[in-house]
């Protein structure tokens, strides 16, 4: 069943989650299929809607033998690439919906299959393997794709807290070679004990977010690839990454050809749930 606004209003049940400050509206779309990018944009509006960095739809995926399919749309309402923190929230939401009673879940997203694990209030998901030949190291930045494209800038002397992430990120986002497709821009500071601080400008949100899961993973891999952390270490466990929204941990295995066994772990919280009555007049605001 596809929801179409043919009446004065419709009722939409929703769940608001956050993963290290990256917040999302989650919708159970297994029976009622919701496909309306303008609606999604309105729902994500922090002044006239519920407010969120993006929308996550949980859909049936029986054909591909996974527990569910995760469809992700940015706050601009458009379907986007993989969202790491969104994936962690989707795993927690799927458990709440009763899709599984176990603390392990198998799901599919735009970039392929993922496994998710729930341990108390922490949720971990495995991420795609990264072919080291696809990582582009330039004199001033590193580019790689961890399910979403990321531009990594390492800060040496600069104070990351004073960085104007919005202005600088926006300027890089559409620059050559990215143009209209854009890129996520990460500013990274290496601290003691191989700890990272990361701030991210996200395309589609068109602003800095409190945390970006794929950006955190990309930052750790870029730091490993440029030998800024864990030089000559094969199995890398629980690299701590500090974001504005909290702490995340990244683990991975580094081989000659690729980074594999990549996992992203952090907190997930159901903030609230409710129902919104969507009036046609509201959509036309």
Predicted regions and their residues:
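A glycine-rich beta-to-alpha transition motif near the start of alpha/beta enzyme domains, typified by
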Residues: 4-120, 152-285
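Active-site glycine-rich loop that binds ribose-phosphate moieties when present
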Residues: 126-139, 167-170
